[in-house]
């Protein structure tokens, strides 16, 4: 989670770790609590976009999201089950291949 956020924001891993730790202490949240990192993005001015659905009301995979929804020249933090990943300039960046996972909510950075 810290890796994805730091990559998307262009910050160091240590900077994001410290920011999340301090915010977590202030709000009584664990460092990796989803409410903590969602609040972090909100405080920085990034709004959560709702989970996209296809015309037949199915969820997009990360690969489909990158091809069809992600904006060229933009960075997106994408929530998938128990994980967040980054799509930057329509390309997936992660330590493992999660292109077949379903997309939840996302943030445009």
Give each language-model segment a name.
Residues 1-49:
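Active-site nucleophile-adjacent alpha helix/oxyanion-hole segment immediately C-terminal to the catalytic cysteine
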Residues 71-95:
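Catalytic nucleophile-His microenvironment captured as a short glycine-rich beta-strand/loop
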Residues 36-79:
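Mid-chain, well-packed structural core segment of small domains
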Residues 16-20, 78, 103:
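Generic hydrophobic, helix-prone segments enriched in Leu/Val/Ile
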Residues 12, 61-65, 90, 94:
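Short, solvent-exposed coil/turn linker segments
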Residues 92-109:
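Noncatalytic regulatory segments and standalone regulatory/sensor domains
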């Amino acid at each position: 989670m810290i890796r994805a956020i730091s990559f998307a924001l262009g910050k160091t891993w240590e900077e994001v770790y410290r920011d999340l730790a301090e915010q977590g202490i202030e709000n009584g949240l664990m460092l990796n609590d989803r409410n903590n990192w969602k609040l972090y993005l909100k405080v920085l001015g990034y709004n959560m976009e709702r989970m996209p659905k296809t015309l037949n009301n199915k969820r997009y995979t990360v690969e489909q999201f990158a091809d069809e929804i992600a904006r060229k020249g933009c960075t997106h933090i994408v929530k998938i089950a128990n994980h967040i990943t980054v799509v930057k300039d329509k390309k997936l960046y992660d330590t493992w291949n999660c292109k077949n996972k379903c997309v939840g909510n996302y943030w445009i950075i």
